[in-house]
Amino acid sequence: MNGHLRLIHSILPATVDLRVTVPDNHPSARNLGTERVGSGSIVDADGYILTVHYVTVGAASVTVTLVEGEQFPGQVAAQDQESGLALIKISAHGLPFLRLAERDSVTVGQPVVIIASSGESERRVNGGYVSSMEPYDGHWEYMLEKTIRTTAFNPGFGGGTLVNFRGELIGVVSLNLNEIGKFSLSIPADYYRDFEQELKAYGEVRSRPRRPWLGFYPQPFGGHVVVGGLVPGGPAERFGLKEGDIILRVEQKEIRSRPELYQQMWKKRPGERISFRILREERSFDLEVVGGDRSERYRS
């Protein structure tokens, strides 16, 4: 028990609370709101903080609060919508920070600790085990080849710190899921490690091909994928997709699942045409959508 307490107390100083304001007219405000709260992990003594993208996208102002109550104005230093991670920068030096665990060091059954903000200088802690490491696909045109699912439920705001029992950062807590019982889904810290220098230098990942963005919410349905909703003014809506459309094929490939849909879409680039075979009200037809650039649309 004393060892666990020492571990928690060693991690706490490197955890932060985030308060973010977003303009009413930013495209993300409709779904994510204009006043957001989050958690973050200090990953650099010079003030870089790792968190989740959905907390910071569109930020007009960011306030960072350390566990002892000291506050700093923050700036969004980098966004990576494909991984779902973001970096905040504060003007401070000599900060306590978390080291990244070795690459591919996380294993199923491994004990872990989550620390998340529940208030400006308040933190909550939960413990559990890694239950699985598998892909995840979300309805907002998002997919990761590997995630960390844990039996530890996120006790606070999104962006919480996931560490091993050596106090090393292994992930950033993104979602609480209720599919079977309660568990949390974290983005592996390896996604940050792979592009750390690019994110710090450019504020984005430039070495990876950009994915086209369509602005729709595909949902699995009876062995097919159906359009569950549309982003107003997005490419899918502008080129004629409608809510309720069943996607039969993309680029001549039959689509049976959301991962298959994303894999086919993402073979293209922003500005290129993507061909769909659609079933709508018992009529099937072909339709083309020119993919947009999500990073441009949601730029702060």
Residue ranges, per PLM feature:
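PDZ/PDZ-like groove recognition
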Residues: 24, 153, 200-264, 279, ...
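Short, compositionally biased
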Residues: 125-137, 261-270, 294
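C-terminal cap/linker of serine protease catalytic domains
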Residues: 1-8, 114, 165, 169-222, ...
